[in-house]
């Protein structure tokens, strides 16, 4: 039984789900906003906020953890350079999820997730 299991399955095996979330996190940090399904946006929010919190910490160990997660190494360095200035006064809540119109093909709930 999956009582109180907080990991959303997203209809994929574990390795595919982790790779998808890594890719979405990388894209969100690079572009600032991503259009995806609502369930993926909610799962992405946790990962993106974890990476921004690591960047705010700014230690070498945090930087290495972020490099191991985010696909683009230069993007990690850019995130660590500007995270303290941009999010220094915030204690979480670095992203915003905005619901949009359903997807035309399968009527899936869509959302835009963006960095605040």
Swiss-Prot record:
* Alphabetic keyword roster: Ribonucleoprotein, Ribosomal protein
| The keyword rRNA-binding appears for this protein | no
* Tagged with keyword Ribosomal protein: yes
Which biological processes are named by the entry's GO terms? translation
A single Gene Ontology CC annotation of this entry is:
cytosolic large ribosomal subunit
Q: Which InterPro entries match?
A: Ribosomal_bL17, Ribosomal_bL17_sf
GO molecular function terms noted in the UniProt entry: structural constituent of ribosome
What binding partners and quaternary form does the record give?
Answer: Part of the 50S ribosomal subunit. Contacts protein L32.
**Which family is this sequence assigned to?**
Belongs to the bacterial ribosomal protein bL17 family.
The protein's name: Large ribosomal subunit protein bL17
Q: Which source organism?
A: Prochlorococcus marinus (strain MIT 9313)
- What lineage is on file? Bacteria, Bacillati, Cyanobacteriota, Cyanophyceae, Synechococcales
């Amino acid at each position: 039984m999956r009582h109180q299991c907080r990991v959303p399955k997203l209809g994929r095996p574990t390795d595919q789900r982790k790779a998808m979330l890594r890719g979405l996190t990388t894209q969100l940090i690079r572009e600032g906003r991503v259009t995806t399904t609502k369930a993926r946006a909610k799962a992405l929010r946790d990962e993106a906020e974890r990476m921004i919190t690591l960047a705010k910490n700014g230690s070498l160990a945090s930087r290495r953890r972020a490099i191991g997660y985010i696909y683009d190494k230069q993007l990690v360095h850019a995130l660590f350079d500007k995270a303290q200035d941009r999010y220094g006064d915030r204690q979480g809540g670095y992203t915003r999820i905005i619901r949009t119109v359903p997807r035309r093909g399968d009527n899936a709930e869509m959302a835009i997730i963006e960095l605040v």
